[in-house]
């Protein structure tokens, strides 16, 4: 066979070889409020400072370091959001992405609304809304693993001092947060989801806890590192796994 003809046949054959499949990336969606969005955080004097990503970005970095190219972490946090807001955008921001893992971090603004005497933001209303969120997830994403992140505060009884008239005086802010965290804890158990007990790993001492907070609610850099580390350890001990070579997508890059 002439050499040029052999080269032509070889090149033609190579061009029609099936493309190598990609290793499937597992998708993690984090949905919540400004603590999840974390493009800025508040200082005590009320000024906003840009930070280099919050716990979602940092969790993604930890996963990429340990499992290169295997996990995609998507941030669906929105500043000021409540449980009702998450319910309203659940289909668009979670279901359509078909995630393998969902992390829900919502409730702090519901607590603030309750303290401001908003009749639509009672613990019962919060429980009802979270139940509806979980119902939709179970119906639309039955194979998805769901985590609910507990809420923390460093305000304790100093809310009225730190925030002025934004919050009324509250003698035991932690007790209010505990009420809502207990709702999350119970519902995750009822729906066979997982509650991430962040409050139990947050510093109890009021002064020490401020080393991890920008304003008593939003974490600072050290706080976001701590949240990301706790979530990473939680995921690692429950659902994270290295991908196998035959774990591939049905579609491939052209």
Enumerate the language-model features and the residues they cover:
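Alpha-helical cap/lid subdomain in secreted, periplasmic
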Residues: 25, 58-69, 85-247
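A short, charged, Gly/Pro-tolerant segment at domain boundaries
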Residues: 248-254
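Serine-esterase "nucleophile elbow" of acetyl-processing enzymes
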Residues: 20-76, 89-98
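Acidic/histidine-rich helix-loop elements
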Residues: 37-53, 77-82, 116-121, 168, ...
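Bacterial N-terminal signal peptides
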Residues: 6-15
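Positively charged n-region of N-terminal signal peptides that target proteins for export
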Residues: 1-5
């Amino acid at each position: 066979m002439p050499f040029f003809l052999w080269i032509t046949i070889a090149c033609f054959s190579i061009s029609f070889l099936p493309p190598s499949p990609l290793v499937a990336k597992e998708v993690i969606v984090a949905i919540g409020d400004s603590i999840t969005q974390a493009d800025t955080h508040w200082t005590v004097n009320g000024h906003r400072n840009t930070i280099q990503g919050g716990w979602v970005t940092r969790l993604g970095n930890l996963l990429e370091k340990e499992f290169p190219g295997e996990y995609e972490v998507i941030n669906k946090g929105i500043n000021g959001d409540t449980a009702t807001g998450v319910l309203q955008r659940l289909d668009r921001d979670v279901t359509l992405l078909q995630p393998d893992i969902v992390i829900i971090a919502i409730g702090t603004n519901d607590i603030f609304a309750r303290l401001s005497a908003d009749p639509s933001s009672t613990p019962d209303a919060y429980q009802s809304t979270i139940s509806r969120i979980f119902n939709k997830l179970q119906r639309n994403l039955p194979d998805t693993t769901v985590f609910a992140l507990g809420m923390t505060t460093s305000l304790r009884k100093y809310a009225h001092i730190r925030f002025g008239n934004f919050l009324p005086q509250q003698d035991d802010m932690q007790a209010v947060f505990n009420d809502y965290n207990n709702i999350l804890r119970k519902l995750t158990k009822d729906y066979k989801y997982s509650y991430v007990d962040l409050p139990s790993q947050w510093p109890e001492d009021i002064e020490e806890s401020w080393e991890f907070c920008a304003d008593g609610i939003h974490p600072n850099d050290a706080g976001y590192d701590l949240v990301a580390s706790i979530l990473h350890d939680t995921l690692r001990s429950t659902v994270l796994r290295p991908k196998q070579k035959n774990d591939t997508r049905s579609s491939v890059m052209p």
